[in-house]
Amino acid sequence: RQVLAFVQAHPGESGIVYCASRRKVEELARSLAAAGVRALPYHAGLEKSVRDANQDAFQQEDGVVMTATVAFGMGIDKPDVRFVCHADLPANVEAYYQEIGRAGRDGLPADTLTLYGLGDMQLRRLQIEQGDSSDERKRIERQRLGALLSLAEAPRCRRQT
C-alpha cells in the first residue's frame, strides 16, 4: 500500500521501484498494474526479449514505472525519472546512492522512498553471520549495514531542494 500511494503521488511520471527478489518484482508489477499504473517488471529471470522490450518502453515512454531488481539500471540514462522507491532495504549505502541517483538527472526535483522494517534488518544480519565469509569480511559487512541503517534513520533528507 505504501508503494502504491507513493507511485500514485506521481501520476504520469516515470519511476523505478527496486525490490530484493524476482518474486516481489512480479507481484508488485501486477498489483500496481491492477491499480491502473503502467508498471513493468525487470529482473534477470525474464527472457531477454521481455527485458529489452520493458527497458525500451521505460526509456521511450512517459509514465512508465519499472519494478526491478538491481539487474535494472546499468546503462539507463533517462533524465526525467521523477522517483525511486526501494520496496526493500538496499544492499548497502553505495548501491543506495547509485540507485537513487537515477532520479532527477534533468536537474528537476525528484523523490525517493525507502521502506524497510525490523525483519529486513534481522534477515540481513542473519545472512552476514551465516555466510561463508571470513570474520574480517563479516565485520566489514556489519559496518556497512550499520552505515546504511544510520542513513535510513537520519531525520533529514541527504539533499533537499
Where are these regions (language model features)?
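Helicase motor core with emphasis on the C-terminal RecA-like subdomain
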Residues: 1-135, 140-143
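Cys/His-rich short segments
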Residues: 140-161
